[in-house]
Each structure stands twice: as structure tokens, then as C-alpha cells.
């Protein structure tokens, strides 16, 4: 017996049967071992018996019983599974005869299945005959699956029913109601139909950005074929979506991938144009399966595409089409391009309205129309790195999923009460052990409290269950309507007019009426009482999801946030002392943005802060970041002194192609792409190279910039703050009593205009002059720094108080108008914090003690009280 005459699957089956015999401690490999392996591991054997309508469960039981009857030989030196039984040897010889009769080149699985029908006194043969299965029926099933093919290679079983194995029948999926409806895209579908109707080169390729609906167009064509809304030439055709991944997966041996693809193409060719092959991500066929000396999938398709034997529809993105298909000119010319543009917001709303019912049925929720409009408009405005309608559909889907999860989870109010009951029950069990009067009194009170909580929990639970049941009932009725509509469509397509009339005028209206009654009843209950569960998806839910994805707050203002925004200026005044104009302008810009009346095409605000060092320019940016985001992490700080050379400018938007760091992206663009809602602080802009400002022109004017990767980065939700020391000497010399005169402002502006180009300055919203700090301002800053020190010491449970004399002395000693507030910090560190630290380390100041800091003869004194 020559094993080379067997297909690889048969060889593997014999090897697995041998392993089974060894594991079972059987001396010989029997027919039962082989068929046990075939029925568990061979898809082909299972498929043959399915087509022949064999009860495989009963067959497997017979095989198990046969294996149990084989005697187990134990002991040392016994060779298990080293020989074939006489019955198996006979089966192999009969299989070779079957191979010769069918004129095949190799013995394959089907020959074993046929050969077992001729075995005498074999339990498997007896069981098949008991099921009234003759060899003729099994042979017919095999020939049906083979589809006229012969076994010409050792991978023959892999190539039977290749389209079923490696593809999905989209038309069958439409008929079974698995695909979502396709709304719009009529022009593109008509274009595809026109190309498919050509004599040669009838292969459209859909090209568009990811998420614009390329695959949906093919699904729309499948739906039209089912509705017979296509020209005569396309009626009754089938669209098979080819899965390149499963075609390549598991092709271990050289030439196996080509054989599989050849089998697919052969089946398409034999269909005489009845099968349209749809290859999603068609760029994957270029180079697919290419190994040393092998031909890739693209080259195998070319001859059939050119002759018009293969109707192929491709879909790929613009970038991948350019990268893969355009490079292969011979392949490109065999396809006709169909460009799929991104739909408008209005078209997206229509698409969402078409999908609304499907989402409602799947999630069991009720979607408001304003939620669909919000999903289209908010995704278009805030999610700029993805495309409509995909991003809008994802928003609606996630909002529905959020509501569904809340419906299925235990409500937080009920959860709290249930936990309280559990806590009281534990306490009750502990108190029952105690016998003293106080414990008994406490137990009595606790039991009354527990009874109240249990009653409340039971009421809430029953209310939750009833609300959940109502929602489930509505969902079931919606599913029923969807099922009936699908039946109606099927009846109309099959011209079953009696059934169609019964559905259209009888069953569907009755179920729709039931749904309306249930929804009305639900609304009535909602109006009358507070409901635990919410099943409505409104624009607020959509806005929440947008906020979660992007970090941009787009929800309607809640009361707490209104207060926070209205008091923003006051809070900033406390953090940044002495710069009232700057604080007011910045807080007004944030207020306009959050109220939704800012220009949607520009950043929230762009400012240049001018002033001497240490007056609060950077501090204001930090305070704003902390107030808007509760942390300074959302502040993107870029020190412009790092961008003094011409070549360093490209670091902002990313290195150009061919340079190191190209893949990493720019320092500014990547930071904003990750956090689109943030404060961008460009510190010391006068130190940057002039070319930096050319990059900033588009950011300030249109709120957008393209990075080195070609991605559009959105700056429309950023506050851009630039700081500079230009004109600080004039501000220091000529500021009188903390006020800046109009003449001084004009002189500073002239210096600024000589430093920066007019087109840059013209795009900035406001140029704010920071005044040098007065002694009164410095006293206010001392208060702030002392408060910060008190917060730091609170961790060690030490409280400090500083007398007014000491504070005034610190302000006078550390005040220097040239350096602003920074010397103040240094003075406090040197004269207050360092002596304090020495006292703490030496053990003179212990935790839980108070320290009074006073002034005596221009020296600080520390009085410690426990």
C-alpha cells in the first residue's frame, strides 16, 4: 500500500487513527478508529453524510460501542497501534478500487466513505444500511458536492464547494433578513450596474475613504437583486463575498493557496456569469499567497478578468488603491473605478432613519429623531479623523448599547438598598449573639429598620422587573413586525399574492396596533410616575458618547457647570492676581465656546500675552487648564526656545518622509490629535524661528493643520495662548500706579509689529498686556503662597499661621518689579520653608501641632503649640 497515492487528508486521518489506537491501548488500527477521526475532524465527511441525510449521532454511537468492544492489551513491551486490522486493510484496497472507478489520481476521503458500504460484518456498514442508506445514495451525495471535479491533487478535499467554504452568499443573507437596509447611494449602485452590464472589463472597483459605505453599496445591489429591481441581465444572479483571509489561512503546503483560489475561480466560471464575486479590501489580492516561484492571487485573476469570464466587484480605500492596485497597471486597467464620496450630514440623517428600526429591535430601546440628527451633526463637527456615515452609526449604536446595559443591570438605587439590607442582616446576626439589654434594644430597632428596607427593596425590585418586562414585550412585538415585513417582502418577490394580502392588510396592521398601544401605555406610565429604567435614546446620550470619545464637552449645560462657567473669571482672579483684563478676556472666550456661539471654523480663542517675567502669563494658562479640566494635563505646553533653528520647525508637524522620526508624528499635532479639547501654550514665542509662524497661520485662521502623514488635525476646540517678553522694558519703566496708558500700549504694539508679520498678528483674537505687579498685588500673592504651604503641611497634620506683619515684611523684602512674583517664591522657600523643615526634622515640630510664624526685629519667629 503506497501512502503517496493517498491525499494529505487521508494520510492525516490514518495518523490520527493510529494515535487514537495508542491512546486506547489497542494493538491494531481498525475501521472504527478511522471513522471516529473522520466524523470528528473531517468537514468533508460530515458534509457528505449531511447531504445524504445520515443520522451521524447514531453512527457515532455505533463507532463508540465498537471501540469499547475492542480488547485492551496492557503490559510492558506491547506495541500499540503498530499494525492495521484485516478489516482496515480490506477497506483501503476497496477504496483504491473506488478511486479507479471514479478515474481519480489519489485515494481521498470520499473513496473511504464509499468503500465502507461494501464491507461485510462491519457495524458501521450495518448501521448505514439500518438507516436505509444504499451506496448509490452516498455516491450521489459525493458527486453533488464534488460538482464534476476529479481528485487530481493531494489537497482535493479542500477544493470542494470552495465558494461555500471561502465566501458568503450576500443574496441569501438578504433573503434571510440578516443584512441591514441600504438607504440612498442610488447613483453609485446604478454606476455599478452599468459597469456589470458591459461585455468585457465588467468589473467595478469601489474606491472611497474608510467608513463611507463601499460594502453597503454591494449589499444594496444584493437587495435590489432580491427585489428584482435590476436590469434583465442581473436578475437571479448571486453575489458571493470572498474572504481572502480564510482562503490563505491553513494553506501549509506550497501550491495549496493557488489550488484553493483556482477551485473558487473554476466554480465562478462554471456558473456561466450567474455568480458575481465581491472581494472586499481587494488590494489584499496583490501579493496574496506569493512565495518563492509562486504566482500571487492578482496574477491568477487577470486572464479571467480580461476575458470577461469573471464578474468581480472590488472595494478598497483611496490610499490602498494607490499603493497596491495602481502599481500593477495590468490589473488596474481590468477594473472600472467607482468613486464613493462621503455622504453629507443630511444624507447621513436619512441613512440613520433607515437603520433606526433595526437598532431599536436589536437593543430594545426607543430612539428619538433628534438623537439621529445630533449623531450626524456632532460626529461631523467633532470626530474629524473618521468619515460619515460610519462614525454617526457608531455613535447611535454605542448610545443604544449604553441604555441597554443600564436596563439589564441592577439600578443604582436598588443596588444601594440591597447592600444596606445585606449590611443590616450581618449586623442582626452579630447582635443575636449578645445577651445584654443594650444589644437587645439595638436589635429591636435594627429589625424594624431592616423590615422597612426589605419592604422598600421588594417594592423597587418588583417595579424594576415589571418595567423590564414591559420593555422586553415592546422589543418582542417590534421583532415580530420586522419578521412579518420580511415575510411580506418574500411573498411579493414570489408573487404569492394571497399571503402578501393577508400580511399587508391583516397580520401586520394588527401587530402594529398592538405596538402603538403598548408604547402609549408605556408613555402614560412614565408621565404618571418616576420610572427606574430609561429606554429613550435622546440627543443627550449622543452628546455624552461624543464627549467620552473626544474629551470635548458637548452635552447641554447642567446646573453645576453653569455656576462653574459664570464664576470662571472670579476663580481665575484668585489664582492670577493683578491681571484683571487678561482674566476677563480669556474667561469670556471659554464662555462663548461652551454656550455654543463661537465660530465653529476657528479655535475657541487665540491670545498673545505680553509682559515682564513673573507677572502671571504662564500661570493664567495653567489656572485655566486646571479650571476647565480639573488638571493641568490637558495643557499642551511647547517651549518655543526649542524651535530656534530652521530645521527644528518640522518637529511641530512631524519629520518629512525619508527622515528619522517620520512615523512618530509632530509634537504639536500629535498632542492635539490625542487631546482635541485642550489649551495650547506656546511659551516665549519671540525666541522661535520665523518659519514657525507660517505654520501657525492656518491654525489661528481655520483651526486646522495637516501633519507630515497627511492627516488633518483639528484645532477648533483648543485655546491657543502665546506668551512673550517683547516690550517688557517699556512696561516696567512707564507703567504708573499699575495702569497702562494708551500711549504706552501703542508703543508696545509698534515693537510687536516690528517683530512679527502683520498676517500673523491679524489672525490673533486678542493681544493682552500684563501689568508689572504692584506691592498690593504682591501681598495678595503672599497670601496665595502661604495657603499652598498650609495645604502641603496638612498631610503631616501640622497647621501654620503667619501674622499679618510677617506677610507684609515678606512682600516688601521680596518685591522686585523687574522679576515679578518669582523672587517671592524663592524668598519664602529660603526664609520660611527651610527653617520650618529643620524644626520638623529635628523633632521640635511634631504631627498634630500648630506653628505660629511672627516677626521680631526683622527676623521670623516660630512658636509651636501642641
From Swiss-Prot:
It is found in: Cytoplasm. Residues 773-866 are annotated as: C-terminal. Residues 6-70 are annotated as: Repeat 1. Residues 3-148 form the Clp R domain. Induction: Induced by low temperature. Residues 161-342 are annotated as: NBD1. ATP 1 binds at residues 208-215. One of its GO terms (biological process) is cellular response to heat. Part of a stress-induced multi-chaperone system, it is involved in the recovery of the cell from heat-induced damage, in cooperation with DnaK, DnaJ and GrpE. Acts before DnaK, in the processing of protein aggregates. Protein binding stimulates the ATPase activity; ATP hydrolysis unfolds the denatured protein aggregates, which probably helps expose new hydrophobic binding sites on the surface of ClpB-bound aggregates, contributing to the solubilization and refolding of denatured protein aggregates by DnaK. This is Chaperone protein ClpB. The gene is clpB.
Amino acid at each position: 500500500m503506497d501512502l503517496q497515492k493517498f491525499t494529505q487528508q487521508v494520510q492525516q486521518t490514518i495518523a490520527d487513527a493510529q494515535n487514537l489506537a495508542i491512546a486506547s491501548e489497542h494493538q491494531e488500527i481498525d475501521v472504527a478508529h478511522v471513522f471516529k477521526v473522520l466524523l470528528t475532524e473531517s468537514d468533508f465527511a460530515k458534509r457528505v453524510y449531511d447531504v445524504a441525510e445520515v443520522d451521524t449521532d447514531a453512527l457515532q454511537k455505533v463507532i463508540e460501542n465498537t471501540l469499547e468492544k475492542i480488547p485492551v492489551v496492557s503490559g510492558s513491551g506491547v506495541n500499540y497501534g503498530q499494525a492495521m486490522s484485516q478489516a482496515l486493510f480490506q477497506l483501503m484496497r476497496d477504496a483504491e478500487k473506488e478511486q479507479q472507478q471514479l478515474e481519480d489520481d489519489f485515494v481521498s476521503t470520499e473513496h473511504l466513505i464509499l468503500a465502507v458500504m461494501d464491507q461485510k460484518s462491519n457495524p458501521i456498514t450495518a448501521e448505514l444500511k439500518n438507516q436505509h442508506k444504499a451506496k448509490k445514495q452516498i455516491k450521489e451525495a459525493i458527486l453533488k458536492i464534488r460538482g464534476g471535479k476529479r481528485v487530481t491533487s493531494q489537497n482535493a478535499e479542500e477544493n470542494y464547494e470552495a465558494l461555500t467554504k471561502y465566501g458568503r452568499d450576500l443574496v441569501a443573507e438578504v433573503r434571510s433578513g440578516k443584512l441591514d437596509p441600504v438607504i440612498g447611494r442610488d447613483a453609485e449602485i446604478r454606476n455599478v450596474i452599468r459597469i456589470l452590464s458591459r461585455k468585457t472589463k465588467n468589473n467595478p472597483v469601489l474606491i472611497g475613504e474608510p467608513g463611507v459605505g463601499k460594502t453597503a453599496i454591494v449589499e444594496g445591489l444584493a437587495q435590489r437583486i432580491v427585489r428584482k429591481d435590476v436590469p434583465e441581465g442581473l436578475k437571479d444572479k448571486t453575489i458571493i463575498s470572498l474572504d481572502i483571509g480564510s482562503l490563505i489561512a491553513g494553506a501549509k503546503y506550497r501550491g495549496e493557496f493557488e489550488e484553493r483560489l483556482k477551485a473558487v475561480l473554476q466554480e465562478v466560471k462554471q456558473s456561466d456569469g450567474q455568480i458575481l464575486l465581491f472581494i472586499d479590501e481587494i488590494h489584499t489580492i496583490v501579493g496574496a499567497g506569493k512565495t518563492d516561484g509562486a504566482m500571487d492571487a492578482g496574477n491568477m485573476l487577470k486572464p479571467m478578468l480580461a476575458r470577461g469570464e469573471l464578474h468581480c466587484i472590488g472595494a478598497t480605500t483611496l490610499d490602498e488603491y494607490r499603493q497596491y492596485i495602481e502599481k500593477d497597471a495590468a490589473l488596474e486597467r481590468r477594473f472600472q473605478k467607482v468613486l464613493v464620496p462621503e455622504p453629507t450630514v443630511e444624507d447621513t440623517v436619512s441613512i440613520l432613519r433607515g437603520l433606526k428600526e433595526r437598532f431599536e429591535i436589536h437593543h430594545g430601546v426607543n430612539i428619538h429623531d433628534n438623537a439621529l440628527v445630533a449623531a450626524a451633526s456632532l460626529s461631523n463637527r467633532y470626530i474629524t479623523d473618521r468619515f460619515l456615515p460610519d462614525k454617526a452609526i457608531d455613535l447611535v449604536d454605542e448610545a443604544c448599547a449604553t441604555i441597554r446595559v443600564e436596563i439589564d443591570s441592577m439600578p443604582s438605587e436598588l443596588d444601594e438598598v440591597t447592600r444596606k439590607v445585606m449590611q443590616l442582616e450581618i449586623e442582626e446576626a452579630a447582635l443575636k449573639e449578645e445577651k445584654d439589654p443594650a444589644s437587645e434594644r439595638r436589635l429591636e430597632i435594627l429589625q424594624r429598620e431592616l423590615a422597612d428596607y426589605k419592604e422598600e427593596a421588594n417594592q423597587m425590585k418588583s417595579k424594576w422587573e415589571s418595567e423590564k418586562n414591559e420593555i422586553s414585550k415592546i422589543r418582542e412585538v417590534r421583532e415580530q413586525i420586522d419578521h412579518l415585513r420580511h415575510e411580506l417582502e418574500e411573498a411579493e418577490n414570489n408573487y404569492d399574492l394571497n399571503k402578501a394580502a393577508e400580511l399587508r392588510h391583516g397580520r401586520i396592521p394588527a401587530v402594529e396596533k398592538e405596538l402603538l398601544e403598548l408604547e402609549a401605555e408605556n408613555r402614560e406610565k412614565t408621565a404618571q410616575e418616576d420610572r427606574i429604567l430609561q429606554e429613550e435614546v435622546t440627543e443627550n446620550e449622543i452628546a455624552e458618547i461624543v464627549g467620552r470619545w473626544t474629551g470635548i464637552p458637548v452635552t447641554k449645560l447642567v446646573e453645576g457647570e453653569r455656576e462653574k462657567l459664570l464664576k470662571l473669571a472670579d476663580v481665575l482672579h484668585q489664582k492670577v492676581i493683578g491681571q484683571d483684563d487678561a482674566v476677563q478676556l480669556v474667561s469670556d472666550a471659554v464662555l462663548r465656546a461652551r454656550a455654543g456661539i463661537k465660530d465653529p471654523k476657528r479655535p475657541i480663542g487665540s491670545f498673545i500675552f505680553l509682559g515682564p517675567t513673573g507677572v502671571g502669563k504662564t500661570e493664567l494658562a495653567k489656572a485655566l487648564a486646571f479650571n476647565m479640566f480639573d488638571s493641568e494635563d490637558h495643557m499642551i505646553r511647547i517651549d518655543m526656545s526649542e524651535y530656534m533653528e530652521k530645521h527644528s520647525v518640522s518637529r511641530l508637524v512631524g519629520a518629512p518622509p525619508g527622515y528619522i522620526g517620520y512615523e512618530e508624528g509632530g509634537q504639536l499635532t500629535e498632542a492635539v490629535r490625542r487631546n482635541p479639547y485642550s489649551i495650547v501654550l506656546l511659551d516665549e514665542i519671540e525666541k522661535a524661528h520665523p518659519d514657525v509662524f507660517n505654520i501657525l497661520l492656518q491654525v489661528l485662521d481655520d483651526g486646522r493643520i495637516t501633519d507630515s502623514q497627511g492627516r488633518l488635525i483639528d484645532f477648533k476646540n483648543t485655546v491657543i495662548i502665546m506668551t512673550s517678553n517683547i516690550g517688557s522694558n517699556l512696561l516696567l519703566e512707564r507703567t504708573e500706579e499699575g495702569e497702562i496708558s494708551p500711549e504706552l500700549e501703542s508703543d508696545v504694539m509698534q515693537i510687536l509689529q516690528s517683530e512679527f508679520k502683520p498676517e500673523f498678528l491679524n489672525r490673533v483674537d486678542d493681544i493682552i498686556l500684563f501689568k508689572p505687579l504692584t506691592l498690593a498685588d504682591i501681598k495678595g500673592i503672599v497670601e496665595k503662597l502661604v495657603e499652598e504651604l498650609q495645604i502641603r503641611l496638612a498631610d503631616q497634620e501640622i497647621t501654620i499661621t503667619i501674622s499679618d506683619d510677617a506677610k507684609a515684611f515678606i512682600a516688601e523684602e521680596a518685591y522686585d518689579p523687574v522679576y515679578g512674583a518669582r523672587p517671592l517664591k524663592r524668598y519664602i522657600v529660603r526664609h520660611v520653608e527651610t527653617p520650618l523643615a529643620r524644626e520638623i526634622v529635628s523633632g521640635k515640630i511634631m504631627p498634630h501641632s500648630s506653628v505660629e510664624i511672627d516677626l521680631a526685629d526683622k527676623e521670623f519667629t516660630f512658636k509651636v503649640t501642641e
